[in-house]
Each structure stands twice: as structure tokens, then as C-alpha cells.
Design a protein with these regions (language model features):
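Catalytic machinery of carbohydrate-active enzymes
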Residues: 1-231
């Protein structure tokens, strides 16, 4: 079982990480003459119970006075050191540049040790109502929070991939380093529900300051915050 070889050469980063993983699963099922479950072929790949999502939505609305007619934008500025990320000032520029057909509420999420940077970002948000939500109740509860988002914004980090598994609309920022590119760590949500930015070719591969934040705000606003959600 554990001595069947499938050569992948992941270091070339020719496709997303999840596709490499799918290749392993497909080969395993093929070797054992098991059909690939249809549910594995399209997102969402994580479907929380409706009652759990409704309860979490009500709790957030009560805790942060989020009005029913608003679009909730969740932004997770922390990265856990997993990859290069935008600065707090860039995230603030991005959020302040978002335009929507409804009022926006910006919920800044933070994990352990990230509350200081989240609070710093909160102080820079001028255009929209905002609050900080510190996640202390575990992964599943945090996923239920993320699932409330009309748009989820972050660098290449774990919460981004939770949002992708939930098929949330995502706006993500990556370095251009081959092992960390938008392609290699692409989220698993529908293509129409994701946007990704990285430093341009003329900039250094990890120069996150070279990303055009104004363009990102415009594209995210047009694709995700006006009209019906994609997908």
C-alpha cells in the first residue's frame, strides 16, 4: 500500500498543491478499482451545517452590531510566518479602497498572537465600519466565521485555504517565488470566486510592496462586492 510510486516533481510548481494531492488520491483509487466520488469533483469541499452557520451569523451580528443589509468582508492580515505578506498599511489602503453596492462591514480576524497587528489595522480603516474578531474557539468555529464572508482577504495562509474549501469569494496575495506562487498555492474554490495578486515581473519575487493595491481594490470591488455573488 505504501510502496506504490507516483512521480510528481512538486518542486517545479507546475500546478496547484491540491492537484498534486488529487493525483495521489486518483491513483490510489484507480489501483484499487474504486470510482472517484462525484462530490470530490467540485466545490464546496467543506459544507458546514446550515444551523451552525446561522447561529454563528447571529452571534457575529450581535457581538459587532453588523446590520443585515451589509456585505461582510473578512480580512486576515496575519500569516503565521508561512509566506511573505502585505504590510498593515497596504491592507488598510486596500480596505479603504473597496467600493460596494451596499455598506461594508470589515471584520479583521486574528489568531493567537495576532491581535496586536489586527488592532493596528483597525485604527487605519476610515471608510467602513470595522471590528477585530480574535479566534479562540478552535478551527471549526473559525471556519463558521469565515463562511459568513461576502469576501475573504488574506495572504497565503491557512485561513485563506479554509475560505477556499468553503467556496467563499477570496482575494489573496502571494510572493512570486516558485515554491510560493499563486498557482502553487491556489485556493480550491471556483475560479470565478477567486482573485490573486503577486509582485510584477519587473519587481523582486518577494517584493510585496510592488503589488498594485489600487488595482486589487478595484477588481475585487467589481467582481465580488457589486451585484450577486459569483458562482
Amino acid at each position: 500500500f505504501f510502496n506504490q510510486r507516483l512521480k510528481q516533481r512538486r518542486s517545479l510548481s507546475l500546478k496547484p498543491e491540491y492537484e498534486y494531492n488529487h493525483d495521489l488520491i486518483r491513483q490510489l483509487l484507480l489501483d484499487h478499482e474504486v470510482a472517484m466520488p462525484e462530490a470530490w469533483s467540485r466545490p464546496p469541499f467543506w459544507k458546514p451545517a446550515s444551523a451552525d452557520l446561522e447561529r454563528t451569523g447571529n452571534q457575529l451580528a450581535a457581538a459587532y452590531a453588523i446590520a443585515q443589509d451589509t456585505h461582510l468582508v473578512i480580512i486576515h492580515p496575519g500569516s503565521g510566518g508561512s509566506a511573505k505578506n502585505l504590510s498593515i498599511e497596504q491592507y488598510a489602503e486596500l480596505v479603504n479602497g473597496l467600493k460596494s453596492d451596499r455598506p461594508l462591514f470589515i471584520l479583521i480576524t486574528a489568531g493567537p498572537g495576532e491581535d496586536q497587528s489586527a488592532s493596528a489595522l483597525l485604527q487605519l480603516i476610515r471608510q467602513h465600519q470595522a471590528a477585530v474578531h480574535v479566534s479562540t474557539d478552535g478551527l471549526v468555529a473559525f471556519a463558521h466565521v469565515i463562511a459568513q464572508a461576502r469576501l475573504f482577504i488574506s495572504g497565503s495562509t491557512g485561513p485563506l485555504h479554509i475560505a477556499g474549501a468553503l467556496n467563499c469569494q477570496t482575494l489573496a496575495f502571494y510572493p512570486r517565488k516558485r515554491s510560493s506562487t499563486p498557482l502553487r498555492w491556489q485556493t480550491i474554490n471556483e475560479p470565478s470566486r477567486r482573485l490573486a495578486f503577486a509582485p510584477p515581473e519587473q519587481a523582486g519575487e518577494s517584493d510585496m510592496q510592488a503589488i498594485d493595491i489600487g488595482e486589487a481594490a478595484i477588481m475585487a470591488s467589481q467582481q465580488f462586492l457589486q451585484g450577486k455573488p459569483n458562482g
